[in-house]
Swiss-Prot record:
InterPro entries: PurM-like_C_dom, PurM-like_C_sf, PurM-like_N, PurM-like_N_sf, PurM_cligase. GO terms for biological process: 'de novo' IMP biosynthetic process; adenine biosynthetic process. It is found in: Cytoplasm. It comes from Methylobacterium nodulans (strain LMG 21967 / CNCM I-2342 / ORS 2060). The gene is purM. This is Phosphoribosylformylglycinamidine cyclo-ligase. Belongs to the AIR synthase family.
Amino acid sequence: MTGERGLTYAEAGVDIDAGNAMVEAIKPLVRSTRRPGADAEIGGFGGLFDLKAAGFKDPILVAANDGVGTKVKIAIETGRHDTIGIDLVAMCVNDIVVQGAEPLFFLDYYATGKLVPGVGADIVRGIAEGCRQAGCALIGGETAEMPGLYDGSDYDLAGFSVGAAERGALLPRPGIAPGDLVLGLPSSGVHSNGFSLVRRIVAASGLGWDAPAPFAPGRSLGEALLTPTRIYVRPLLAALKATGAGAIKALAHITGGGFPDNLPRVLPEGVGIALDLDEIAVPPVFGWLARTGKVAEAEMLRTFNCGIGMVVVVAADRIASVEAALREAGEAPVRLGRITPRGEAPVTFSGSLAL
């Protein structure tokens, strides 16, 4: 080809070579997520998964996608990018396991104004860690460099996961009724919801991300707030397997909307949930947020998980076996309340949060 040299894609702000270099850098991370059904090799046009090799006989597929909201902004402003990928995986696979399904594979979308391969590799390092925790394979993704759409090297993330359950094993199960008991599984902190409010409170406090965290001795504020979302997949799948059909009737991932908005999603018509807030060991971060931002308890409950990241609805006569199975899997279940006849509100509270 001859002729006068014109503009190049790189001069327009898109560096294909940087993208290719990043793909090569992350291949070992991706391979570390191999599992039955997937070899976790990337570079082709699509990722493959073999359901038969994964051991399923008559599966129903379950899909979920999510992001991590403005928690990404804290990762960007602190320069800490190696755990935000764990959050991305958690937000998707926790939504899959509440259906009674095993997460099988994961794909990510990473969009940025300017691709910095080291940052991208750190993000994928977290994604791979999340996939290993969940037992799912990272089989593909997309890195999009879009100058002019994002400011500098700012970025956003989205995740996509697919899981499977044998036909007839899906949750919630029919028969949720008054008298069933409700367990809570502790969160690691704020997880990945409510960060627009978190960032507003931090700004009002006058603290920088590198300041000592008032609620976490020995850690900076940014580091503490970036604590990754817990992934509940392995303990919940272990408990479902150990206790058999009918013991665990429903699971609810406590994300945006908190208890009031997420619990009704798994309830049939005519029943509600009564929770005793006195039973929750509220992590110190929530007390600091509530006091510093003067956030009312009702707003805390509808914005944050307040210390409980997953709720488990259990048949009353199977409660001991479910608690034992969860403890055996490393969880610390808390008895939060019970299923009741539906009143004016589907979720009612007694006691108060220790904020």
